């Protein structure tokens, strides 16, 4: 893809796995409540088998191959990370995104069903599904980044996350909660492709390596989120839980101000 369309292309990819996160949660809850948790794993296994068959038949092989690549050579690139200090900032932002995304929905699920909101299982399903609106809006990230620059899209998206998390903690109105959840999801959905694009811009060499590391760190957040959620669910006030998540987003916002607007200044010499 040309650079102009790269952010848009990445937006489609990131939207797909965020979409699977929302649909997957709803599907698993429906199956678990109706048939038991074992059926959930059986259904998912069948879906993966079908998906494997579809991918093997319909997805073409990549025309770009390098059989000379060795694992030892790939691992040796880790020392280059410290040459790209701005990329480390992007890695930190990536770590916070899915951590907050999964943690927010875990807390939100409990919050809606609490005595503060008086929602039920159907209400949580609807609120989660409406979050898809925020994901669809992120498909315009490429066009917006062309107008504002990638780093400004990242900053605005992080601000949207902070405001929406605070908003979720101070209201018990289900309509307002739904609105803020959509804004939050949009902030995450805008931020992911923008950060990936920024990593590619900052890494003058070994872009594939740095993008691979960024992807690993991004999904590392999915492992951190359940652990974080356990502690957040023990808090007596939901406002405190949402505030902690907003502080994580605030830390990412502060880091974003140390990331240059253009290419890595260390490699532009």
Task: Place the predicted regions along the sequence by residue.
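Intracellular juxtamembrane helix-capping segments at the cytosolic ends
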Residues: 1, 190-203
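Helix-loop-helix hairpin linking two adjacent transmembrane segments in secondary transporters
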Residues: 9-59
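A membrane-interface helix-boundary motif in multi-pass transporters
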Residues: 33-45, 231-249
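Juxtamembrane intracellular "pre-TM" segments in multi-pass secondary transporters
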Residues: 60-90
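Extracytoplasmic gate region of multi-pass secondary transporters
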Residues: 86-128, 132
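Helix-to-loop junctions at the C-terminal end of transmembrane segments
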Residues: 137-149, 233
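C-terminal transmembrane helical hairpin of 12-TM major facilitator-type secondary transporters
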Residues: 149-195
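A late C-terminal transmembrane helix in Major Facilitator Superfamily
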Residues: 201-238
């Amino acid at each position: 893809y040309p650079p102009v369309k790269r952010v848009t292309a990445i937006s489609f990819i990131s939207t797909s796995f965020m979409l699977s996160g929302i649909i997957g949660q709803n599907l698993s809850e429906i199956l678990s409540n109706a048939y038991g948790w074992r059926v959930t794993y059986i259904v998912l296994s069948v879906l993966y088998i079908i998906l494997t068959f579809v991918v093997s038949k319909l997805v073409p092989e990549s025309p770009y191959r390098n059989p000379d690549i060795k694992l030892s050579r790939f691992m040796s690139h880790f020392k280059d990370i410290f040459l790209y200090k701005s990329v480390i900032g992007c890695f930190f932002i990536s770590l916070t995104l899915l951590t907050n995304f999964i943690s927010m929905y875990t807390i939100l699920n409990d919050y809606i069903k609490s005595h503060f909101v008086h929602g039920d299982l159907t209400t949580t399903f609807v609120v989660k599904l409406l979050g898809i609106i925020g994901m669809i809006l992120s498909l315009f990230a490429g066009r917006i980044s062309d107008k504002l620059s990638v780093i400004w899209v990242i900053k605005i998206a992080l601000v949207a996350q902070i405001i929406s998390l605070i908003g979720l903690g101070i209201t018990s109105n289900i309509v307002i909660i739904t609105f803020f959840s959509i804004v939050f999801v949009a902030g995450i959905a805008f931020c992911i492709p923008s950060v990936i694009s920024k990593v590619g811009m900052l890494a003058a060499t070994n872009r594939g390596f740095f993008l691979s590391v960024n992807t690993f760190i991004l999904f590392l957040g999915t492992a951190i989120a359940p652990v974080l959620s356990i502690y957040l669910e023990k808090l007596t006030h939901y406002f405190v839980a949402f505030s902690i998540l907003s502080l994580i987003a605030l830390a990412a916002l502060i880091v974003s101000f140390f990331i240059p607007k253009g290419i890595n200044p260390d490699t532009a010499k």
